[in-house]
């Protein structure tokens, strides 16, 4: 706010200024802040004779012009006065704050009134009570948000677990898994069909068990087999040779002590020679451009089983369903490895009556909801039911059923599938 300045009233043309020389002389020795006595204002008669000045002190009530004279004196006094040091800018004056914030205070008061009104407890009506009871009866009330379990907390000190990067690693696996999926190749294979492929994969499961190989080796073997068949026609008589060479390559890649070529010749009952296996191995590698580092089903199974917090029985059930899905051509073509792995978890939890079937932790780490998994999970449950029906009618068991019917694997192949996945209903 700027300081208001006094406006000097314009002198009338009738005013006469009389200068007293005596007072002027005295003004040279006048003290600071002294009275300026050499200016006298007033109206005089037309004969230019000044009226006699009354030397009695006049008050402001007797002569209002003294107020103007006081205002005239102030600038002169300030001009001759010793300049005061400049004041450092400080807080605004109280008057200014009051004037500026007067409107805002009213606004704050209105806001406070609104907030107070909003915080008032709403009156509970009979209709709202009935609505809440109806929702509770129908199970429509909001469930408390389930907490996501930190499945890597126990592996913080394990450098091989790569806890800092594990989330990024699996995000990368999911982003590239579709690049290495085999396409639908049966139409381009004149001599083989889906049944022949199923027989070959089940035979590879038996060979895998006999050599006591790691699970990674089996899933990589099937991946190499399907990728090769999707780009190169193979005669029926060489189909088993392709499977043997794919197994040899996978074992060299995954195992510390892979089986020898002679062992593969023996297990194939000398149907193929040592040289034929090595030549086919070279043909497959050149066809696939030596690219063997791919995200297989096992890569996702290892992570998803950990997220499921599964015991040994659950883990064997998951592997049984996953291998069952890999055996069937339609499952391999229709669904990605991560989808099959997640669906195997869902179908296994359904068969073993785990509650809840699908948790927030599983949804977070798999990236799939129950709705997304339902088609693949139903297909796995149907294949599980069909294998059990065929096994009960036949005197011999298939390699997969035999493998998972043992007590050391909790005989998970004998556990019936969940009825909910077979009938399509929500209740098991």
Swiss-Prot record:
Q: Write out the tissue specificity statement of the associated record.
A: Expressed in root tip, lateral root apex, shoot apex, leaf primordia, axillary buds, stamen and petal primordia, ovules and developing embryo.
Kindly give the InterPro entries that the UniProt entry links to this protein. Cyclin (IPR039361), Cyclin-like_dom (IPR013763), Cyclin-like_sf (IPR036915), Cyclin_A/B-like (IPR046965), Cyclin_C-dom (IPR004367), Cyclin_N (IPR006671), Cyclins_cyclin-box (IPR048258)
Q: Name one GO molecular function term.
A: cyclin-dependent protein serine/threonine kinase regulator activity
Q: Which domain of life is it from?
A: Eukaryota
Q: Which UniProt keywords apply?
A: Cell cycle, Cell division, Cyclin, Nucleus
From the Swiss-Prot or TrEMBL record, state where the protein is found: Nucleus
- BP GO annotations: cell division; mitotic cell cycle phase transition; regulation of cell growth; response to gamma radiation
Which Pfam family is one of this chain's hits? Cyclin_C
For this record, an example GO cellular component is: nucleus
Q: What induces it?
A: By auxin and nematode infection in roots. Down-regulated by salt stress in root meristem and shoot apex.
**PANTHER family recorded for this chain?**
CYCLINS
Question: Subunit arrangement?
Answer: Interacts with FZR2/CCS52A1, FZR1/CCS52A2 and FZR3/CCS52B.
The family classification in the record reads: Belongs to the cyclin family. Cyclin AB subfamily.
Name the chain's protein: Cyclin-B1-1
Question: What organism does the record attribute this protein to?
Answer: Arabidopsis thaliana (Mouse-ear cress)
